[in-house]
Swiss-Prot record:
GO cellular component: extracellular region
Notes on activation and inhibition: Tyrosine, phenylalanine, and tryptophan moderately enhance chorismate mutase activity at low concentrations, but allosterically inhibit the enzyme at higher concentrations.
Signal peptide: 1-33
Subunit text: Homodimer.
Additional remarks: Was identified as a high-confidence drug target.
Binding site for substrate: 49, 60, 69, 72-76, 105-109, 134
Protein name, per record: Secreted chorismate mutase
Biological pathway: Metabolic intermediate biosynthesis; prephenate biosynthesis; prephenate from chorismate: step 1/1
Amino acid sequence: MLTRPREIYLATAVSIGILLSLIAPLGPPLARADGTSQLAELVDAAAERLEVADPVAAFKWRAQLPIEDSGRVEQQLAKLGEDARSQHIDPDYVTRVFDDQIRATEAIEYSRFSDWKLNPASAPPEPPDLSASRSAIDSLNNRMLSQIWSHWSLLSAPSCAAQLDRAKRDIVRSRHLDSLYQRALTTATQSYCQALPPA
């Protein structure tokens, strides 16, 4: 019995659908259904962590403390490396990402110190205690690490750079980041797309 054209069409459509369903998982989509980057939450957490630089700088200025605290940095990076290892994420990648984040944060603090050196009256008179800011930083570190784990495959995919650029544009717009924060965000995220492909 001859196959009718409609049956041929349906069979072909089904075959194409199956083929596409097999191909689709091979690469992450460039954006979610709402048009936002899949890296938006990670980049937003990085931006929020950068914003903690302002109250930290204000406290250090009033307390006459140095901006850089190598002991605290080493402690943070060691813990993050251990946490990454426990989640089967490359610890070298994680420590590199957070080292970038810390250097970007310190750059903002140095900028604030420079402003207040020129105009001491512009410094916040009663900054929040440093412990509150550090608690916020620890929480944001965990949030960022969770996002890295969730998007590990994407961070090593060819589409990572495009997703990262989209996420940065969206976060700059939504958080109204000025030029200083935009440069800091670029530094903080510069190693995101250097993850090794999953074994």
